[in-house]
């Protein structure tokens, strides 16, 4: 088998390699995308009692590739991404060569899809054997630093597997992305898997159009059991034998496959992060040669790539061991100077280092750490160029929140000011801001999350030329109204639940990191009930007049607030920021988050009237009736409020209500200002929410 930058599996030469690689201990990877996510349209109709009984069923990485053809497989170092690529390459080539062991049967072997289940299911793969090609970008760079193109042989492949993205210069990504796009354009039927750490892939630009991001799931109990069984030296190990119990302090570190596998073979088994990594260090040749400083130097000093690779190999090619030692070096003395250099030098990989430091921090003296972490926060007025230091300080402090009352510290007020500035100004990357949103929630988000923006009376173009349900395009007149700047968030909806006792199927209502996230898993009836409650509350408090009510918007109001005066053009998608898609402007499937986030993280996704998050994030309920047929509305355009579509009082639950805006699971063509969806009013999902309108009547559209 040819080795180096390029792996093309030739089974006449590679049986020994494949045996070492597989070692019969291969555990198929799962991703965080679930069957429930894929089947959400049918599940939205299920009762809340039934949904509470459903355990998430995760797709495998192979099935993610089967679904999307071009995928970004992201996850922390040590989670098995490289092993998956090699096994996939071996088994595809093995199927073509009629290998008795490494073939499609091996790569599609059954998996347990749930956290605790025991039912095995064969993985779904539809396209048979494909000619594979595995590219290791790091080795490619070592071979020729001036290389700006892939080897010509890659063009013969039907399945292209790319590893080593973590280790290339970010500037090199530009030509790598260009090569990938060219190969994709030459043959749209090609399959691609690009493996990378999440912190790196999330920040690399340009993005790859047409690629779907999937996150590798941490180990389930079923996977841990299989690893324990396969790594056991006991020949009499029986099914049903209990797994080794993971200590609470090690639970985060042992979510990673490589670390858990190593831990199961240790005797006695370490009970803390420190003892675990110290035991790992004993296996390394450099254990006696200043390992902490060597690891710190690995990350902070510019060195020849071959020298860096030599150090990496000497630590068993274990990136987490290197990170542990580098963090340990920082904590010895001069923490601020050392750690600041470490994370700023790392650029894309800094958050992986921060996560390691947080694991170590749990076992350290909280009082000492508090002053060290607070001192990371800059003084003075917030500035974009220093904001990363404030965010790191907030994230580290969050980890020791249970040991000390940090929120009473005077400097926390300054820290919160910086974190809010990151959120509101769109500083740093989207993924940094997602962390900032969580930390702002914990510190106490002092934005006015129930803020209303005023929409003046006027007329606008409603609809577009792209879909029949959005036509004909027409000019619609609207009365003045007010609408929520943000979707209704958890902290506001929880107040309603606490006062009324209404049932809410949500795991977020008591989560201190998600108070400023959109309230989700809500039916149309939930949204209406909330509005009725808030009407009475705000009238009593004098926030609205006695002749004003709170309600959900009509379709026309929602679209006007989202698009403003933007005119529809043929073949043009319309968003709050204008026409044409922009990366990182909103939370849709293209972002790859597969989750909500704090409201207001995307200042570019602000409508002309000041509304945020109207594209992506969550589908938003409207008052307008759709009809019984999910594909074709009973009430077509042009919009007419007098034709019965706003007569919700007598509508039955089989009559769908309109939903707008798309969600984190929607593609860019669905998360527009014009796309129309419909759902039964008893349906709900973790991507469904709403925002409020305040007006003097029940129908804001004028004739």
Residue ranges and their predicted role:
Residues 1-19, 426-427, 431, 435, ...:
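GGW-centered surface loops in extracellular recognition modules
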Residues 4-46:
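Charged, amphipathic alpha-helical linker segments immediately N-terminal to NTP-binding catalytic cores
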Residues 35-286, 293, 300-306, 316-321:
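P-loop NTPase signaling cores
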Residues 37-53, 143-153, 307-308, 462-480, ...:
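Short, polar loop/linker segments at the starts of domains and inter-domain junctions
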Residues 247, 251, 308-314, 319-449:
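Hydrophobic repeat-domain scaffold segments
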Residues 447-506, 515-535, 615-616, 692, ...:
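A short glycine-rich, aromatic-capped structural motif
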Residues 461, 508-513, 522-675, 702:
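Functional-site microenvironments in short loops/helix caps that host divalent-cation chemistry
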Residues 684-700:
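Short, structured beta-strand segments at or near domain termini in extracellular proteins/domains
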């Amino acid at each position: 088998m040819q080795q180096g930058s390029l792996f093309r599996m030739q089974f006449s030469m590679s049986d020994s390699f494949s045996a070492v690689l597989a070692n019969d201990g291969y555990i198929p990877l799962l991703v965080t995308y679930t069957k429930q996510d894929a089947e959400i349209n049918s599940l939205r109709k299920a009762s809340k009692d039934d949904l509470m009984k459903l355990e998430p069923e995760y797709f495998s990485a192979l099935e993610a590739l089967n679904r999307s053809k071009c995928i970004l497989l992201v996850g922390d170092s040590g989670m098995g991404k490289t092993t998956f690529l090699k096994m996939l390459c071996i088994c595809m080539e093995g199927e073509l060569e009629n290998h008795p062991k490494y073939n499609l049967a091996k790569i599609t072997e059954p998996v347990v899809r749930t956290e605790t289940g025991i039912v095995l299911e064969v993985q779904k793969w539809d396209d048979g054997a494909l000619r594979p090609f595995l590219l290791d970008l790091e080795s490619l760079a070592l071979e020729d630093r001036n290389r700006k193109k892939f080897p010509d042989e890659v063009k013969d492949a039907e399945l292209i597997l790319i590893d080593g993205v973590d280790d290339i210069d970010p500037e090199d990504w530009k030509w790598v992305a260009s090569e990938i796009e060219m190969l994709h354009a030459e043959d749209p039927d090609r399959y691609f898997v690009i493996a990378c750490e999440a912190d790196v892939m999330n920040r690399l630009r340009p993005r790859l159009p047409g690629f779907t991001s999937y996150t590798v799931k941490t180990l389930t109990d079923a996977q841990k059991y299989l690893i324990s069984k396969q790594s056991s030296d006991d020949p009499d190990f029986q099914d049903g034998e209990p797994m080794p119990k993971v200590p609470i302090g090690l639970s985060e570190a042992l979510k990673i496959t490589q670390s858990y596998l190593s831990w199961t073979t240790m005797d006695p088994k370490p009970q803390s992060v420190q003892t675990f990594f110290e035991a790992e260090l004993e296996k390394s040749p450099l254990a006696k040669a200043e390992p902490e400083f060597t690891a710190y130097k690995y990350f902070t000093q510019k060195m020849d790539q071959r020298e860096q690779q030599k150090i990496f190999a000497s630590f068993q090619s274990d990136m987490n061991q290197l990170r542990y030692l580098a963090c340990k070096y920082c904590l010895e003395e001069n923490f601020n100077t050392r750690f600041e250099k470490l994370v700023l030098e790392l650029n894309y990989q800094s958050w992986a280092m921060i996560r390691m430091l947080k694991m170590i921090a749990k076992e350290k003296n909280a009082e000492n750490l508090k002053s060290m972490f607070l001192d990371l926060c800059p003084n003075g007025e917030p500035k974009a160029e220093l904001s990363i230091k404030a965010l790191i300080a907030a994230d580290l402090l969050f980890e020791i929140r249970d040991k000390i009352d940090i929120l009473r510290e005077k400097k926390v007020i300054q820290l919160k000011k910086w974190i809010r500035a990151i959120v509101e100004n769109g500083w740093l990357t989207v993924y940094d801001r997602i962390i900032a949103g969580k930390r702002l929630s914990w510190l106490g988000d002092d934005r006015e999350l129930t803020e209303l923006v005023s929409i003046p009376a006027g007329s606008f173009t409603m609809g577009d030329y792209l879909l029949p349900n959005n036509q004909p395009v027409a000019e619609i007149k609207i009365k003045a109204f007010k609408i929520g700047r943000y979707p209704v968030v958890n902290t506001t909806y929880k107040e309603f639940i606490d006062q009324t006792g209404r049932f809410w199927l949500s795991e977020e209502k008591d989560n201190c990191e998600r108070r400023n996230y959109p309230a989700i898993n809500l039916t149309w009836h939930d949204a209406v009930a909330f509005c009725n409650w808030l009407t009475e509350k705000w009238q009593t408090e004098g926030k609205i007049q006695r002749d004003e009510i709170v309600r959900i918007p009509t379709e026309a109001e929602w679209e006007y607030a989202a698009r403003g005066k933007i005119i529809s053009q043929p073949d043009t998608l319309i968003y709050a920021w204008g026409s044409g898609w922009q990366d990182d402007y909103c939370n849709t499937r293209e972002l790859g988050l597969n989750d909500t986030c704090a409201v207001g993280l995307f200042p570019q996704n602000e409508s002309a009237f000041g509304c945020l998050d109207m594209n992506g994030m969550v589908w938003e309920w409207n008052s307008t009736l759709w009809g019984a047929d999910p594909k074709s509305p009973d009430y077509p355009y042009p919009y007419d409020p007098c034709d019965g579509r706003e007569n919700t009082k007598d509508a039955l639950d089989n009559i769908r209500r309109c939903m707008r805006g798309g969600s984190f699971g929607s593609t860019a063509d669905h998360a527009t200002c014009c796309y129309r969806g419909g759902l039964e009013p008893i349906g709900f999902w973790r991507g469904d929410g709403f925002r409020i309108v305040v007006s003097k009547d029940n129908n804001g559209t004028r004739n």
